[in-house]
Structure formats: structure tokens, C-alpha cells
Amino acid sequence: MSGILDLLNSDLGKSIVSGVAGQTNQPENKTQDVLTMALPVLMSAMKRNASTPEGAQGLLGAINSKHDGSILDNLGGLFSGGVDSNVLDDGSKILGHVLGGKQQNVENALSAKSGMDAGSISQILKVAAPILMGVLGSQAKQQNVNSPSGLDGLLGGLLKGNSPQHEQSFLESILDADGDGSVIDDVAGMVLGGNKKKGGLGGLLGGLFGGKN
């Protein structure tokens, strides 16, 4: 299975990057950088949330109904004239559910790493979240996923299927390192415990997430 980051290099991914960049008035290369960092974090957070029976059922319900992948069938229509406010509202709800109280920390980390302001990061994530759910719904349909165990395998495959040359693969291993606690706390603990690249994303995440809540 192709990973979520491999998607960004596909024709569909290029359409997503181009559309999100146009919607947020940001350069495509910077938008791609942000999405390359953000998508594994969001996907890992979804995987963590789906590790409980209630979380898995909630996610299954969402991708079997509203987020069935149909959003991917008309990306041109989605982005032409600006993304509909209903889609952005949906994105806000998805982010709130997936990241909870850590959303601002994630946005600040992505902002500091990419050099893009946090407001633009927030807009990118709001547009990307419903599309990511659509990708998940589409993959679930293709693989006939209809159980929590199947969902866990799907999410794990999308994370672990990423090409090894992607520098963001370290993020996925960090996020998967601990079975309990929040995704962001896992990141902080790992990078604070062995932060060899002070100037890199590890140092950034450690600084932003290392303090008390």
C-alpha cells in the first residue's frame, strides 16, 4: 500500500497541493512542505483515537457516510471560487476531534519549521482535514474495511507505506513509539529524550511540547 506521503507526489496529490495553495494564497512548495509534515501527524492522531472501540466506531461511521471519498472526485469544483465554508467548518471540527487541545501547539510547530504564519497553517489544515478523511474513506472502500481491526490496519498501512526517502518517516516512528498518552506528548518525550539535531523539527517539537500543559 502506498503511504500518505506518497500520495502527495501523485497526480491527485499535486491537485490537492495546488488547490490548497491557491485557497490559502501560499506558494505551492511551502504548502507541500507543510502537508508533508502535517499529514503523518494527523494520520497518527487518527490511529491513536481509533485505538479505542468508541473511537474506531466513530471514525468508521464518518468514513462510511459523510467522508466516503467523494470529495476527491471533484477537486476542481472544490477549489474553484474558493473552498465552501461548510468544508472549512467540517475541517475545523475534524481537527478539534483529532488533535483536541494540542491543535495550537501543532500549528505553532509547523509554523516555526516552515516559516509560514500560524494563521495560514491553520487554514491549510482546515482544508486538508476533510480531504484526508476523503482519502481514508476511499481507501476503506477499496479494501472493504468495515471493522475496527481493519481500520487499524488501514491507518497503519498508510503510515508505514511511506517511501523511506521521505525525511518525515522519523515523525511516524516517533508518533507510534508509545501506545498511551497523546500523540504530541509522544513526540515531545522522544525528541526531548534524544535530541541530536537541535535546529531540526525535533528541537522545535521539544521546545513547543516539552512544557507543562
Task: Specify the residue positions occupied by each region the protein language model found.
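A structural "flexibility-hinge" signal
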Residues: M1-N213
